[in-house]
Amino acid sequence: SGPWMCYPGQAFQVPALPGCRPLLKLQCNGSQVPEAVLRDCCQQLADISEWPRCGALYSMLDSMYKEHGVSEGQAGTGAFPSCRREVVKLTAASITAVCRLPIVVDASGDGAYVCKDVAAYPDA
């Protein structure tokens, strides 16, 4: 496996990680996340191999914004009415850490838990 195996629709379903959407909304609002929601999200993420996990989270965040008529590079809060964008991005980027699922950060095979590309989602 490797980064070339990470195409949306191939490495993960599109829309990506439907089970993680409620987790993201609850977490960025500072709400308590029910165990079942956490379990669903982490299971969906665990079903995706290490390389594409961040891509799947990026795709999920992207589609949540786009469904509310926001394109990359534009500010929009429709998807997350009471969350600041920085919080949304960092929360999404940390879902792998919340689930304790490793990701591959670079080609050297270094593993970590936070998806930097998701945290850097270009929306502002």
UniProtKB/Swiss-Prot annotation:
Name of this chain's protein: Alpha-amylase inhibitor 0.53
PROSITE patterns linked to this entry: CEREAL_TRYP_AMYL_INH
Subcellular compartments: Secreted
InterPro entries, sorted: Allergen/soft/tryp_amyl_inhib, Allergen/tryp_amyl_inhib_CS, Bifun_inhib/LTP/seed_sf, Bifunc_inhib/LTP/seed_store
Keyword Hydrolase recorded: no
Keyword Disulfide bond: yes
Family note: Belongs to the protease inhibitor I6 (cereal trypsin/alpha-amylase inhibitor) family.
Species, as recorded: Triticum aestivum (Wheat)
Lineage: Eukaryota, Viridiplantae, Streptophyta, Embryophyta, Tracheophyta
PTM comment: The disulfide bonds are essential for the inhibitor activity.
